[in-house]
Amino acid sequence: MRFLTFITITILSCATAVAQELFSPNKVLKLSFSLSAEGTPTYSLFYKGKEVVKPSRLGIELFSSNEVKFGAEITKKEGVNTSLYHNFEVVNTQNTTVDETWQPVWGESQNIRNHYNELLVSLKQKDTHREMNLRFRLFDDGLGFRYEFPEQKQMPYFVIKEERTEFAMTADHQAWWIPGDYDTQEYDYQQSRLSEIRAINQKGRQANLAQTGFSDTGVQTALMLKTDDGLYINLHEAALVNYGAMHLNLNDKTLVFQSWITPDANGAKGYMQTPAQTPWRTVIVSNDARDILASDITLNLNEPCALADTSWIHPMKYVGVWWEMITGMKEWSYTYDVPSVHIGKTDYTTLKPHGKHGATTENVKKYIDFAAENGFDGVLVEGWNIGWEDWFGHSKDLVFDFQTPYPDFDIEAIHQYAKSKGIKMIMHHETSSSIRNYERFMDKAYQLMNKYEYPAVKSGYVGNIIPRGENHYSQWVNNHYLYAIKKAADYRIMVNAHEAVRPTGLCRTYPNLIGNESARGGEYQAFGGSKPNHVCVLPFTRLIGGPMDYTPGVFEMDISKNNPNNHSHCNATLANQLALYVTMSSPLQMASDLPENYRRFPDAFQFIKEVALDWSESHYLEAEPGAYITVARKAKGTRNWFVGNTAGKDFTSKIHFSFLEPKTTYVATIYADAKDANYQTNPQAYTIQKVLVTNKSKLTLHSVAGGGYAISLYPLTDKAQAKGLKKQ
């Protein structure tokens, strides 16, 4: 909800001079725009007078098309000009200033300021008279720009062959990156110089169930960069609607990135009808890494909430029948008796169960009991529905119906049992990437959820996309993801999409999108493990676009203790797993481990039970990509605070509690790595201490590599609470 009025100044001028300059409201950033001698739009970006993006070209390359006319006979005019990147002239410019404050339904802050200066450049191509606008918005912490195509007779339709947006770097920066891929983002991050990307990619990439690379120098956004003189730069996009996701392809000779849009099955990057626009391209810049994490540019470049009523959207903390399957203890499937499943024909009541099915009524009730005993909101159940026996690897269209439970999953009994305990069930819709099939059953699937009062669904898109040849992040498939979110809103259902395109801030417009995976999540700790600094990179990259359903909370790091046949290791300390609930903010948070593992460490589990999901304030206290992150957040509607620190390397954290209310004493419970903690050899070594703090207190704590700490802070309401506690 917006609660401050727009403060706008609009200046219209017929542009006689080609060169234009735009400053951020605080004058720290400067954008320069001009046309080259060939009429190619060009921009550059400066931070405190220092060049961040060298002169970079803008434009679109089209597929050649034929103009077809029907008359006495069909005629074709061939060779339509494919260039939308040169021979332009400026016909008009418009400057605007906006300063507003709006309230998200949920998020890291209760109030978000949207303050920018805007330059709109209207262009016309001299030979074709086609029109294209470039809209630049300069915030105090970065730049957003996009292409806009007014409705016009000269170009009512067009097909994009490639977007030619450039980001020309000033030097061989340090980068935190994952390989460019049309089908997966589930990679460990690399840290290297830009010039080293090619060699690292050529050594091979981690295998995944669906992956399609396109270049040895291709990378995905959000891309995190750091210059040798300490400037932090983040490249991403915002408001990805009706378009393919943007990758970046590096010319490692010139150090120029060019946008590389995910194509469809025919190689097209976008089918457009005017009026149309691209997503925003974003450049966040600061000499302080904390500002990258605190930036609201991605959200501010998205449209306001499109839902008239959001009262049904609530953050959820949940447990689930999931880690048992991920670790290999249980299975999603019900039987080994069928070589293949025919949805609607296979009679499961005649088949022998293999005895390893996880989603049984009896097992689910145990999780419901655990959730109720510990104050959780919901229980996720995967593998409840028929079809898992041959769900993957067969390019199968009719793979699930999203309605029919296995014989040992009594959906009505579970509904009634959960309701009696005050627990909401979370639905699971694995699509096996058969998108047409999911849309075929979507209404009935959502109606089933309404019938049994499921408020949220976890959807999955594992494997190669059907229609065959499509990519996970192409225009058509991205439109499907948004269709599913909009359709879910019609049924008052919240969506947590896994394997979908990485977020670009659309949760502002559709706040029922409460979670995404779209990166290498916690499950990979049971698939061989992730790098110990992975969670210190994700907030600088994947989380720039929106929250992640990372599934933290693993307490048993030795996966073989759960399943003797799985020798994976969770590369984190127990204190690190607690901290993730704060450092990787999300309105949807899972306690992913088994109930029995939490019962072994009830004192540490207390933090997971208490930590909030929705915030009124967030203060980033310390940050360096891949090395450490420390953040303090205030729980919305309370006076309580939570602090989290994750460390990718040995790190001594030094924080000041100046964010606390003045003249107020807080009881701080500190969950930290023990002195002998080690993420490989002694991950469950932690300490818990209680102290009294005020806004004048300071704290120094050591976190080991792969470790961290978590703190809960509650105002002192009774002097008895302070008995025996030291002041910090």
Where are these regions (language model features)?
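Aromatic- and carboxylate-enriched substrate-binding clefts and catalytic-loop regions
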Residues: 382-569, 573
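N-terminal accessory beta-strand-rich subdomains and adjacent acidic, glycine-rich linkers
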Residues: 21-308, 685
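An acidic-aromatic substrate-binding cleft motif
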Residues: 273-366, 374, 378
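C-terminal beta-strand-rich structural cap/linker in extracellular carbohydrate-active enzymes
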Residues: 690-727
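Catalytic domains of carbohydrate-active enzymes, especially glycoside hydrolases
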Residues: 362-384, 449-455
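Bacterial Sec-dependent N-terminal signal peptides
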Residues: 1-21
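Carbohydrate-binding surface patches
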Residues: 624-666, 709-712
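Catalytic cores of secreted or luminal carbohydrate-active enzymes
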Residues: 575-622, 710-712
